[in-house]
């Protein structure tokens, strides 16, 4: 999930620094009708302190953190203050976790009483380790407002109510709303006031709020927020006729973590010591944004280890422990499959026994898969259950992940934990498919014959979640099927089809060392056009069916492994014309790339320009886009601008939400 909550401290620093800097999203930027007060925020951070530390060590750490806050923020000793935990806790006031109108001595004592101690908020318990201290702002209740900006598939939505504060009530029922469609400008201040501020009598406050909302939305878009709520938002008018001050007293926010490459430097700068404390000698670049775990969900040592592994690889490794005493553990390949398996377990009434949630995907190495599997097996075998435990190693049909390679890592971990698995009475159920799936399943089946642990192995002949009811005793083995049968000696069998592909075999490929702008000679273009014309009459796809048996694609990016896999699949299916027409690689000149068609070599042209590739192969109406998350928006926009392209398959993960929504709207 890309939308990650941030601390109130960080959210207010972002807003304070960029409120007057972010470029407007309106057609014209109005003159601000409000004054921005000086930002004063002090953080008391004890996140490195553990509850298992001695009382003296915890007390010393608390005093050191309080002293540091006082040293960096001398204003703490001369003003009335507000103190509260800053750990993504909702309704802190109603939970007794808010101190108002206190001096620094009272704040320190209040923090000492609660720091590194467990508290219950509703049904959730957690340890308080981070506190926010800021000046107390006295104000009448009638100047408290509520504003929220949130993102939806079709655009952004601004909500506003003229009544804010603790007793705001049902926001959805009473809020006025303003929709901002994707790629559309924000309305002018008068329109904002007419849509959202009709219940405010004061013209001064209405003007201040209208221009503040314009600025707030500018920051929201500029910094890739996905949610931003201020309650209460206070407008303080002055007796001398100066601009009213707009103060955001309480704030909750989420950022799009996948947009860190785009906005990460801005997030860091607003939180640097030079900006926060105004000292010229301080570091001008702040720390990377911290995305804390939800209250009551501190990362365990194992979760932190997998998170560290995930950060060091291009693959995806995720682990969340739900119930360490649960008897159902999963090791699922793919984010979508992890949801499907969890839903299947919950649908059978075993949600309370589900011990973990996570996934491994993106072609992790054998070593990475071993470390991931070892971590899960270690957690699983720490405690015993009378009825034993179940390990579900599941997954759909992999695109590029080598099943045999990842299974080598899992098998290595299973062998290492053999005695613990036997002692814990663990049964293992496997369902997987994809590249080299037979080799991987064969190795897993052979392991089951020698390990001393029951291992049932199933392949693509079995429904993806069929092993779940079998593992949980809700279905018999006969209902699931006989399981994996090693029926094929090799995955690319001999074929009676022609040994050379149809269109590429007739291509007159240009010498890549020559300076000709086009790779494919007219004869090749004519062959491609003839192939398209021959199938046009009976192969024209319906508007709702993007693919047919004769669909041809352009592969964007230098991905020879993926292309070879597609050609192998074509050959197995006895296609006469390969599904890959050509490749596009913008960072090199036109050339050709060697591939195999069955056991024969063939050449595919590689173009530096997408437009040139499309013109040379007018029958190709699909693009498989391997561009990275940083460049996929620009490249996909170009693809969608070509009339012949009907389908674009985006492989990149971690595309910023705002980019994805713009692509959907094109």
State what each model feature region is.
Residues 83, 330, 393, 624-625, ...:
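Redox-cofactor binding/interface segments in oxidoreductases and associated redox assembly factors
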């Amino acid at each position: 999930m890309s939308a990650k909550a941030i601390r109130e401290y960080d959210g207010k620093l972002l807003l304070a620094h960029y409120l007057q800097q972010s470029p407007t999203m309106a057609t014209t930027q109005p003159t601000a009708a409000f004054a921005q007060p000086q930002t004063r925020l002090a953080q008391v951070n004890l996140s490195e302190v553990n509850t298992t530390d001695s009382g003296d060590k915890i007390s010393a750490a608390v005093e050191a953190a309080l002293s540091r806050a006082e040293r960096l923020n001398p204003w703490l000793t001369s003003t009335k203050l507000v103190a509260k935990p800053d750990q993504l806790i909702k309704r802190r006031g109603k939970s007794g976790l808010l101190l108002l109108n206190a001096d620094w001595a009272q704040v320190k004592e209040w923090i000492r009483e609660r720091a590194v101690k467990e508290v219950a908020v509703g049904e959730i318990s957690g340890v308080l380790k981070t506190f926010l201290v800021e000046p107390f702002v006295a104000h009448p209740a009638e100047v408290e407002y509520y504003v929220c900006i949130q993102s939806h598939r079709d655009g952004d939505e601004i909500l506003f109510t003229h009544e804010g504060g603790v007793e705001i009530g049902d926001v959805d029922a009473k809020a006025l709303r303003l929709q901002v469609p994707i790629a559309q400008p924000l309305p002018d201040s008068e329109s904002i006031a007419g849509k959202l501020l009709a219940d405010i009598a004061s013209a001064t406050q209405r003007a201040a709020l209208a221009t503040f909302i314009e600025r707030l939305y500018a920051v929201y878009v500029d910094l890739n927020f996905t949610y931003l709520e201020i309650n209460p938002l206070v407008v303080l008018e002055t007796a001398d006729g100066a601009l009213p001050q707009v103060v955001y007293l309480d704030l909750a926010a989420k950022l799009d973590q996948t947009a860190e490459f785009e906005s990460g430097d801005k997030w860091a700068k607003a939180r640097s010591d030079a900006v926060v404390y105004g000292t010229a000698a301080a570091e001008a670049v702040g720390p990377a944004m911290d995305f804390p775990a939800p209250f009551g969900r501190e990362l365990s040592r194992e979760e932190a280890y997998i998170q560290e592994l995930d950060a060091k690889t291009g693959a995806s490794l995720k682990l969340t422990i739900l119930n360490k005493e649960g008897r159902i553990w999963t090791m699922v390949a793919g984010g979508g499959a992890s949801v499907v398996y969890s839903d299947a377990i919950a649908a059978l009434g075993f949600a309370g026994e589900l011990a973990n949630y996570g996934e491994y995907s993106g072609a992790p190495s054998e070593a990475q898969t071993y470390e991931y599997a070892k971590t899960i097996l270690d957690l699983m075998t720490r405690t015993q259950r009378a009825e034993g435990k179940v390990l579900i190693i599941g997954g759909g049909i992999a695109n590029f992940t080598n099943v045999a390679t990842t299974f080598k890592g899992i098998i290595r971990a299973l062998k290492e934990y053999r005695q613990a698995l036997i002692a814990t009475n663990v049964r293992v159920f496997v369902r997987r498919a994809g590249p080299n799936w037979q080799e991987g399943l064969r190795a897993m089946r052979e392991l089951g014959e020698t390990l001393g642990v029951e291992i049932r192995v199933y392949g693509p002949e079995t429904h993806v979640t069929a092993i779940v009811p079998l593992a949980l005793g809700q279905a018999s083995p006969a209902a699931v099927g006989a399981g994996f049968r090693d029926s094929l000696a090799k995955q690319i069998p001999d074929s009676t089809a022609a040994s050379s592909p149809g269109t590429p075999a007739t291509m007159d490929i240009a010498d890549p060392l020559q300076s000709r702008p086009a790779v494919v000679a007219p004869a090749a273009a004519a062959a491609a056009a003839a192939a398209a014309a021959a199938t046009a009459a009976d192969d024209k796809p319906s508007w709702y069916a993007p693919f047919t048996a004769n669909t041809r694609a352009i592969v964007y990016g230098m991905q020879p492994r993926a292309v070879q896999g597609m050609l192998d699949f074509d050959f197995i299916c006895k296609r006469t014309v390969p599904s890959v027409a050509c490749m596009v690689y913008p960072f090199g000149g036109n050339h050709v790339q060697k591939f195999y068609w069955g056991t024969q070599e063939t050449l595919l042209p590689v173009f530096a320009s997408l437009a040139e590739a499309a013109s040379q192969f007018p029958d190709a109406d699909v693009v498989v886009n391997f561009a990275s998350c940083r460049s996929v928006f620009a490249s996909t926009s170009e693809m969608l601008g070509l009339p012949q392209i009907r389908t674009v398959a985006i492989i990149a993960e971690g595309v910023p939400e705002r980019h994805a929504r713009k692509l959907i709207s094109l």
